[in-house]
């Protein structure tokens, strides 16, 4: 792939300890847990396993850094932005290493890991520009008063990161949190802690003061739950399943009513009308379903195709799926890697079995690929109905469900008939049809004649059980600030 430096196979593991107060340290218990390569299920290394006592230490480090009068609290906003720019530059310097490390940790193709890192750098630079622009305002109130607002940092934030985009999701949360002046504990997914720990070393190198960013690897049921329920953490940002997100919100409410932002599950529809360019729509729907091995909250797993082109679409979709290059993620032409672990592999295979049992037609795939790792063949089903369980629940795997529809009103109702509302897409050359569809969709993002494009400048998030609030763009700054109103009585107001 042009412009991408070659990967490093089996990159050196430079950091496997907990990062607190700008130091890599052993966990309090001195326990470690294994991290595996999902391509072959071979152990990569052992990482120090954080527990509640390590979270407490990280919280105290955050509180010390956030104390009034500290270098972090007194730092000029322009200087804070400079540190974020510096962190982006360091990531750019080490981009090939970080992409290689992420590929080993997740199994995703190296070229995709590389693009993830490019996007991380863009996000850091975007929010670096916001550091000295997230300002309050003066308000012209009645009477002899001077009224204005301040946008102040929330304080100590807990960032709970998923395994599907480890560095990308960390950056989506960390960059705006830092731009607003917060301190944070990052808890990466237990399966994929390595790039987060390496990023911690770059945070120190960039010049962020001790305690501002702390990274504690560990298990969700221990560290994640404790962050959600911790009395001294002011905000939690979580990306993961709706089921776990509800537990996070319960813990947040029962503890100190901490603020929550949630990016949760999805079951996104992609609608193809008969007037579109068919090969292009097939390609876009293919990538929507299989990108990142289907391990995306915004995966376009429900493909609705107009009845006039349905059979031909299915035929071409099967051709695309069967030709998708599956295998070694370090090869530049590989498009499809393994699922993250055995648990997820088994869940996907069970969904496939249930789909066949309910009468959906398996057109290709549906089996394990190879005899090592957790590879699932790109899988296509036709003759799927909305009532089937795998049409309603998030599979989080490489399974494309192709359904037939007759007209606009019908497909709008079917698209919206779900518990989720992450994203949707329409492929059509009719501008009036596209406007009707985009306005009717009950979801956070609608793509027209494209799929899976998001930008640092634009908000991303879901309706309904797909989440709360937005990440990226100016909208996410609200999630990491408190608005304070200040009112002075003055001798005389003048215009």
From Swiss-Prot:
Organs and tissues of expression: Lens.
Family annotation (SUPFAM superfamilies): ALDH-like
GO molecular function: oxidoreductase activity, acting on the aldehyde or oxo group of donors, NAD or NADP as acceptor; structural constituent of eye lens
Keywords: Eye lens protein
InterPro entries: Ald_DH/histidinol_DH (IPR016161), Ald_DH_C (IPR016163), Ald_DH_N (IPR016162), Aldehyde_DH_dom (IPR015590)
Function statement: Omega-crystallins are structural components of squids and octopi eye lens. Contains relatively little if any DHAL activity.
Similarity section: Belongs to the aldehyde dehydrogenase family.
PANTHER family given in the database record: ALDEHYDE DEHYDROGENASE-RELATED (PTHR11699)
Protein name: Omega-crystallin
Organism: Nototodarus sloanii
């Amino acid at each position: 792939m042009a412009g991408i430096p070659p990967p490093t196979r089996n990159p050196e593991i430079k950091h496997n300890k907990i990062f607190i107060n700008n130091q890599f340290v052993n966990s309090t218990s001195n326990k470690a847990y294994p991290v595996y390569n999902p391509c072959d299920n071979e152990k990569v290394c052992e990482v120090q396993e954080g527990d509640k006592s390590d979270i407490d230490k990280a919280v105290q480090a955050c509180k010390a850094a956030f104390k009034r009068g500290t270098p972090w609290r007194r730092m000029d906003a322009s200087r804070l932005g400079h540190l974020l720019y510096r962190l982006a530059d360091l990531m750019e310097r080490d981009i090939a290493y970080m992409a290689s490390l992420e590929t080993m940790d997740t199994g995703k193709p190296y070229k995709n890991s590389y693009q993830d890192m490019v996007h991380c750098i863009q996000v850091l630079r975007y929010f670096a520009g916001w550091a000295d622009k997230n300002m309050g305002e003066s308000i012209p109130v009645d009477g002899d008063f001077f009224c204005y607002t301040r946008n102040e940092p929330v304080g100590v934030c807990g960032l709970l990161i998923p395994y599907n985009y480890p560095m990308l999701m960390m950056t989506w949360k960390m960059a705006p949190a830092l731009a607003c002046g917060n301190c944070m504990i990052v808890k990466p997914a237990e399966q994929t802690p390595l790039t987060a720990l390496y990023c911690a070393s770059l945070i120190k190198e960039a010049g962020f003061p001790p305690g501002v960013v702390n990274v504690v690897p560990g298990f969700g049921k221990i560290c994640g739950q404790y962050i959600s329920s911790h009395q001294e953490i002011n905000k939690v940002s979580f990306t993961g399943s709706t089921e776990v997100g509800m537990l996070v919100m319960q813990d947040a409410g029962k503890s100190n009513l901490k603020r929550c932002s949630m990016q949760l599950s999805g079951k996104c529809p992609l609608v193809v009308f008969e007037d579109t360019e068919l090969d292009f729509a097939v390609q876009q729907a293919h990538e929507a379903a299989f990108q990142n091995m289907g391990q995306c909250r915004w995966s376009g797993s429900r493909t609705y195709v107009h009845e006039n082109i349905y059979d031909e679409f299915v035929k071409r979709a099967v051709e695309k799926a069967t030709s998708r290059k599956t295998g070694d993620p370090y090869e530049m032409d590989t498009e499809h890697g393994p699922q993250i672990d055995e648990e997820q592999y088994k869940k996907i295979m069970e969904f496939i079995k249930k789909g066949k049992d309910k009468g959906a037609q398996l057109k290709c795939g549906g089996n394990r690929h190879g005899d090592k790792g957790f590879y699932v063949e790109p899988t296509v089903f036709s003759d799927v109905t909305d009532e089937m369980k795998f049409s309603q629940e998030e599979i989080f795997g490489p399974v494309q469900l192709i359904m037939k529809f007759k007209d606009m009103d019908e497909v709008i109702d079917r698209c919206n008939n779900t518990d989720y509302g992450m994203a949707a897409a329409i492929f059509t050359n009719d501008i009036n049809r596209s406007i009707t569809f985009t306005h009717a969709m009950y979801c956070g993002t609608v793509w027209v004649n494209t799929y899976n494009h998001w930008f640092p400048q634009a908000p991303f998030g879901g309706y309904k059980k797909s989440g709360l609030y937005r990440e990226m763009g100016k909208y996410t700054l609200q999630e990491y600030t408190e608005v304070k109103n200040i009112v002075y009585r003055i001798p005389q107001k003048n215009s």
